[in-house]
């Protein structure tokens, strides 16, 4: 699927959690979240096996329990405002997210998936998971409850029948994620979240009204 990249530039010094003066950050969110076409007669997919054991020994691109809590909090705080039950962490979905994120290719590899990227001119810039999910959540004001368009990432975050979540944040090397080798971007974070059952199911007129509550 061809992705249109929406680029937002901001000086982090102007934000509440400002970085040292001079640092520039760029966020990329694919403009078109994927929709899942299903047979209306089909049952919702069965969630993969859940596992909640996380090895405390994590490398730079691992996912610690603290980071899992950040992913869940960023999603479930938003869901709490719109009716759905909280998502629970799923190790299989996380493993799939990490496997894809580690390729550092900026595109979807499945339905029921949100992606985003964050670049910074400073090396070793932190993950900032809350900002990645916050970028998706900020689409809520763009959602059109008549056409069901305009907020594909947000609708997946709050999709009522989604129950399981697995995410990964991966530090990609320079020259990937659409950037050129040797350019100013020193930190390139790639964020991938997988959801099950998958959201954004079409036909939209049948599935969105019962799954998305503005």
Curated annotation (Swiss-Prot):
Q: Which residues form the SCP domain?
A: 72-195
Keyword Secreted present in the record's keywords: the answer is: yes
Q: Which residue positions carry a glycan here? A: 61, 144
InterPro entries (UniProt xref): Allrgn_V5/Tpx1_CS, CAP_dom, CAP_sf, CRISP-related
* Signal peptide as annotated in the record: 1-18
Q: Which keywords, in A-to-Z order, does the entry hold?
A: Fruiting body, Glycoprotein, Secreted, Signal
GO CC, any one term: extracellular region
> Any idea where this protein resides?
Secreted
Q: Which residues form a coiled coil?
A: none
Where on the tree of life does the source sit, at the highest rank?
Eukaryota
The family classification in the record reads: Belongs to the CRISP family.
What is the name attached to this protein's record? Fruiting body protein SC14
Originating species? Schizophyllum commune (Split gill fungus)
